[in-house]
Amino acid sequence: MDGEVKSYWFKTFSHKSFSVIWDLFYNTSNGVTKKTINSGTILNHLNEVGLAYWVMGDGSLHREGRVLTLHTQGFSHDENKMMSEELNLKFGFKSKVVKHKNKFVVQFTTSDANKLHDLIKPYLIPTMQYKLPRKL
């Protein structure tokens, strides 16, 4: 190469209509903004497509291929517990909160493999199919 550096960039924009989404995941108190999740967010807003996107972004499949973890370490234990409970209530899972490197994550058990597979498979892009739990 001749020392020329190629780069690409893009610009995003902000709009007041995104404030509704911001309010679901951030709380400002005493001038400090913290990531959070409000009760009912999963029950009222998450569907199968959203769950598939969540798995593609933050999911990891264990070696045996039947246990899936959502890496939710950015949330507190109580927030993880609430998310797990709402996922279980909304979709009929048996997920649980487990400790992972001194933080907490939501984990789907092997008993959820078939249901999780069937729910998200239609929405996973081909390069993310490796995150799909194997059916029992």
Swiss-Prot record:
Encoded within intron 3 (LRI3) of mitochondrial large subunit ribosomal RNA. GO terms for molecular function: endonuclease activity. Belongs to the LAGLIDADG endonuclease family. Its EC number is 3.1.-.-. It comes from Mycosarcoma maydis (Corn smut fungus). GO terms for cellular component: mitochondrion. This is Probable intron-encoded DNA endonuclease 3. The gene is hegI3. It is found in: Mitochondrion. The keyword Hydrolase applies. Its main location: mitochondrion. It holds the Pfam family LAGLIDADG_2.
